[in-house]
């Protein structure tokens, strides 16, 4: 490898890791000038400013849903604070990653992180570079992507604040119907899509609850014909299930019909709904800012 090529590698590694020139040179020399191996070397030796942030919790950020003529995807890009998530550099990174993901095939998140841009930088490298540049841990937490056919109606919805994104795939129907379902799911966040998805244990629990309520609150319930009692119980059970089952919920854009009826009226069937919300499932860190500032002052005084 020529000296010019070596210097180019050092420059690239410095951009990615924000580590000093000497450390980048040493890392590459110890890694046969392989960038990925050099990044690992810096990480193991604690030389990368960006990689030192790897143990921090990134629970803020943005989600985005995108589609083209063949594929649809939704992904979550995280930062440590919502302030950084509003930074134009972060937004530009999100858009770039979205374009790369949509244009590439990958099996899982690990594969997605290996996708390269036009300059030969992987998404993983872009994240490390952003971490070094912005000063917070930046991560691609999760991504869902699938292909679809002409027989399907597919629409995406990303809420204006970038905190919620939904994709809806229907068999039949049209884009307007798929869009309405996406907006409904974004707003109400149903736990289940179909009634049949609700676990039997939960259904039995609800049934017992509803039966007790019917005997206590419905006048002369025990004297009514069996078919009437069954109808009353079904209505009460469905009402309770509608709190968390999509198909039983009144449509957000037209409460006169349930989602199930709305789809049936438009010859559409739900095939897939995916909803991402920023930070869901992440245990956020409680930061004592006073203690953090004092610690930084003490570290500064030691220098």
UniProtKB/Swiss-Prot annotation:
Gene Ontology CC terms, in alphabetical order: cytoplasm
Pfam families, alphabetized: EF_TS
Keywords on record: Cytoplasm, Elongation factor, Protein biosynthesis
Region (Involved in Mg(2+) ion dislocation from EF-Tu): 81-84
GO molecular function terms listed in the Swiss-Prot or TrEMBL record: translation elongation factor activity
Listed InterPro entries: EF-Ts_dimer_sf, Transl_elong_EFTs/EF1B, Transl_elong_EFTs/EF1B_dimer, Transl_elong_Ts_CS, UBA-like_sf
Subcellular location field: Cytoplasm
Family: Belongs to the EF-Ts family.
Protein task: Associates with the EF-Tu.GDP complex and induces the exchange of GDP to GTP. It remains bound to the aminoacyl-tRNA.EF-Tu.GTP complex up to the GTP hydrolysis stage on the ribosome.
Annotated protein name in UniProt: Elongation factor Ts
Protein source organism: Mesomycoplasma hyopneumoniae (strain 7448)
Organism lineage string: Bacteria, Bacillati, Mycoplasmatota, Mycoplasmoidales, Metamycoplasmataceae
